[in-house]
Structures are given as structure tokens and as C-alpha cells.
């Protein structure tokens, strides 16, 4: 039986890409019976009834799965944040990073609209970028008005499945339009009333850009830590994870425990205060989370 990857799911149909093209498939009834929903990004076995139509027979095990957006087997996330309009927001970036790290997806931080900043804001954003690079993250500067800066992103998209996510109104769709102009994805300017952009993408689809596949997603419509526990959180902050191995107590939450290596690293300036502050805020959110039944 032929195998392929689901690149689009729409109205009960799954569009499976394979060596000979794309086949529009339906799911077998056994999926509903077993409560399995094929997702964009799934590697599947399918049966072709004719050159253009068929059925999905089997879904292979997933290495990861996101709920919002509904996509599986993601290799990396391009987290797009703007320098201005809206202003760069490290607190929101850290929230995205935690969610991405928790799902074992490699993050690439992409800061857009650098052509719109004044010198003061440029220095501020570059300082943040240097902090994140020291934590081990890749950080890129882009502008949709210069193709050269977008070209910097292209090598990161090769031979992998990427999710584009980030704050609304930062230019995610505009960036993909520059990478592949024939997409003609809709874009929205910032709402003067709300001070943020309106999401312009409505379904998940994997789009070929070079040798890679990129999903233009709704940008994580939920940023709640639904499945993350306090003990997981340290591992979602690389610099906290590194320091925590030297804490005196196993299971240290890095809040009030004595001889905590993380708190010591903050005091010594090895961990930035804003990252530690965000960590503490996220711990509080998780502890106040209502239980699910």
C-alpha cells in the first residue's frame, strides 16, 4: 500500500502528498470507532480508488501533536515577533517558548519589522536577541520589505516541517507571501481600536517552500499551560534546566528552597531577571489552574 503525508485537512477530506502527487482521501470508519482523527502532518498508509481519490487506512505513530493548531510531527516552530507595531514582548515570547519546548519542537525566534524601529528601540531589541542567543536559541532579524532579510530564513526551512506562530499582527502571512508569492495569503493591519492584529488564517495547510513544508497556522489560539505541570516547567527554560542540576534538592521549584542553584544564578546575573520573573509567573498560573475532570 502507498504511503504519504497529510498536507491539508478540510471538510472531512485529507489531502495526502506522495511520490506521484496529491490524493484526496476520506478516513475509514474505523478511525471514528477508535476515536482517531488524522491530522495535518500525519504519515499515513492510503488506498487509491482512482488517480485522485482514496481512503486513509492507517496513521503512523506521531513524534508530537499540537491541539491548536491541530498538526502532528512538527520539527520546528518559527516564532515571529515584531520589534514594533506591536512592540517586542519577551513575556509573550517566553510563553510560546515554553509551549514549544514542552512538545519537543525546535524554536527559531524571528523578529520582524526591524526596518521600522528607531535607534533606541533597535538597541533594546538587539539586547533581548543577544540574551536569547546566549540561552541557545537561534534568533533572526527580518523585514518583509527586504527580500535579503527573508532569504536569511530560507535555509532553516529546508528538509523539515515547520510551524509559523507568534503574536497576531506581526507579519506571519506577509512573511510567507514573500517566501512564496503565489500563496497570496490574506494579511491584516493592526487594529487601531484593539492595538493588535486580527488572525487572517483559518485552517492548517502544509505549504512547500523549497525542500521544506511550512504550516501557516492561527498562531496558537490557546496559550494556556493546560498539560504542563510545575515540575515540567524547569525543562522548558534551557538555562534553568542547566543550572537546576546543581540544586541541593531534587524537585526544587526554584522559589523558596535553600541552596537553589537557579536563584544563585539569577543573583549572579547568569540567568536574566525577566526570564526568572516569567518562570515564577508561569508557576503561579499552573498552581492556580482549575482541575480538569
From Swiss-Prot:
Q: Which PANTHER family match?
A: SMALL RIBOSOMAL SUBUNIT BIOGENESIS GTPASE RSGA, SMALL RIBOSOMAL SUBUNIT BIOGENESIS GTPASE RSGA 1, MITOCHONDRIAL-RELATED
Q: Which InterPro entries match?
A: G_CP_dom, NA-bd_OB-fold, P-loop_NTPase, Ribosome_biogen_GTPase_RsgA, RsgA_GTPase_dom, RsgA_N
The record's EC number reads 3.6.1.-
Enumerate the UniProt keywords alphabetically: Cytoplasm, GTP-binding, Hydrolase, Metal-binding, Nucleotide-binding, Ribosome biogenesis, RNA-binding, rRNA-binding, Zinc
- A Pfam family for this UniProt protein? RsgA_N
Question: What Gene Ontology cellular component terms go with this record?
Answer: cytoplasm
The protein's organism comes out as Bacillus cereus (strain ATCC 14579 / DSM 31 / CCUG 7414 / JCM 2152 / NBRC 15305 / NCIMB 9373 / NCTC 2599 / NRRL B-3711)
Kindly list the GO molecular function terms attached to this UniProt entry: GTP binding; GTPase activity; metal ion binding; rRNA binding
Instruction: Tell me what this protein is called.
Output: Small ribosomal subunit biogenesis GTPase RsgA
Amino acid at each position: 500500500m502507498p504511503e504519504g503525508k497529510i498536507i491539508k485537512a478540510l471538510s472531512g477530506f485529507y489531502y495526502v502528498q506522495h511520490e506521484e502527487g496529491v490524493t484526496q482521501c476520506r478516513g475509514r470508519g474505523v478511525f471514528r470507532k477508535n476515536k482517531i482523527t488524522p491530522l495535518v502532518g500525519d504519515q499515513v498508509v492510503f488506498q487509491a480508488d482512482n488517480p485522485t481519490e482514496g481512503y486513509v487506512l492507517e496513521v503512523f505513530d506521531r513524534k508530537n501533536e499540537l491541539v491548536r493548531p491541530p498538526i502532528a510531527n512538527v520539527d520546528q516552530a518559527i516564532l515571529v515577533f515584531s520589534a514594533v507595531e506591536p512592540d517586542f514582548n519577551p513575556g509573550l515570547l517566553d510563553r510560546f517558548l515554553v509551549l514549544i519546548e514542552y512538545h519537543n519542537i525546535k524554536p527559531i525566534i524571528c523578529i520582524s519589522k526591524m526596518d521600522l524601529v528607531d535607534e533606541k528601540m533597535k538597541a533594546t531589541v538587539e539586547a533581548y536577541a543577544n540574551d536569547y542567543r546566549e540561552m541557545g536559541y537561534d534568533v533572526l532579524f527580518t523585514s518583509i520589505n527586504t527580500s535579503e532579510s527573508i532569504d536569511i530564513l530560507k535555509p532553516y526551512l529546508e528538509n523539515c516541517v515547520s510551524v509559523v506562530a507568534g503574536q497576531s499582527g506581526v507579519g506571519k502571512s506577509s512573511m510567507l507571501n514573500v517566501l512564496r508569492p503565489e500563496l497570496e495569503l490574506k494579511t491584516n493591519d493592526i487594529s487601531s481600536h484593539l492595538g493588535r492584529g486580527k488572525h487572517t488564517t483559518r485552517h492548517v495547510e502544509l505549504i512547500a517552500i523549497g525542500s521544506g513544508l511550512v504550516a501557516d497556522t492561527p498562531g496558537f489560539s490557546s496559550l494556556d499551560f493546560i498539560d504542563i505541570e510545575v515540575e515540567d516547567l524547569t525543562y522548558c527554560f534551557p538555562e534553568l534546566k542547566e543550572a537546576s542540576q546543581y540544586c541541593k534538592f531534587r524537585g526544587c521549584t526554584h522559589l523558596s528552597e535553600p541552596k537553589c542553584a537557579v536563584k544563585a544564578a539569577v543573583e549572579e546575573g547568569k540567568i536574566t531577571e525577566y526570564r526568572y520573573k516569567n518562570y515564577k509567573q508561569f508557576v503561579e498560573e499552573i498552581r492556580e489552574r482549575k482541575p480538569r475532570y
